[in-house]
Amino acid sequence: MLNPDGAEVFTRRNTLGIDINRDALDLASPEGRTLKSVRDSLEADFGFNLHDQSKYYNAERTDKPATLSYLAPAYNYEKDINEVRGNAMKVIVLMNELVQGFAPGQVGRYNDDFEPRAFGDNIQKWGTSTILIESGGFLNDAEKQEIRKLNYVSILAALYSIATKSYEKIDLAAYEKIPQNDRKLFDLKIEDVQYELLGNTYTLDIGVHYLEVDNASHSEYFTKAQIMDLGDLSTYYGYETMRAKGYKIIPGKIYTPKKGEQPTKEKAYSLLKKGYVYWLGPLAMGDNGFNFPMQVVSNKFVLPDFRLYVGLNPSFLLSKDGVISHAVVNGYLIDLQKESSAFRNAIFLR
């Protein structure tokens, strides 16, 4: 691991404040100097460059997440292909073929624009065939456990092809057939929903991301949803998509509990069906938020006039034919008829 200090607190930069992966030329960081020294001492024929990647990347023009993205980095601006880079491309073709059996359509080809300061690009230039593996998203795998397995079988396939030299028979053109990755995924996409503003009704799409917020020790997190885009999102996709034609957005109300009334999941579903989205009163919020499907508000909280905008933490109701059938609480879609959801947590609003 190149940056253990950054990994401890989920940040790209090291304790010095440097992005080590932009330090291949200056070698100002001790980590960068160590990596360069190891590469030069080994003069390895092949190298694997493992990265974490946002889960919002997809295989281009598909709704499939780019669970893994591969790249044989360019070593110059012209993106020339010499034997060193070509060998990396050939191995990637075999890796992709194997992974397709476990995650069909969920492999992308990372952008190969040359970055002269990056280690991957320079290690390729220094003579080691470099294979970048970016680990993106996989449905219902927030901790990337399934993606770890795909990394394992992917690297195993690569090592076998190197040991047997089977990669040498691969046609380079097959590398270009791997779809490029794109960044057009939302956690939740609501399509064609009706939204009333200033007396007029509009039909639009809503795209939501679940942003992770760490606790003080970085040992746990809660999610805070945010609207990332509004309007025509027909070229975007969602891990979860609701086709909401005929549904109307209904602003939620605040519920004031009776003395001694306890917040339960059953109570929350009942209140949501009646138009309440917010629970007034003190609740103990854990490190991973409130495991209670209503937003929790303080006595000082004033419910603003309802309006959608990019950056909003979305909480509202959805009705069809006058019946409230769904709720969106902290960006999580809840089917009130089935009382089912992938709900993770609500948040406290002051």
Language-model segments: residues:
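Active-site/substrate-binding loop(s) of hydrolase catalytic cores
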Residues: 1-105, 124
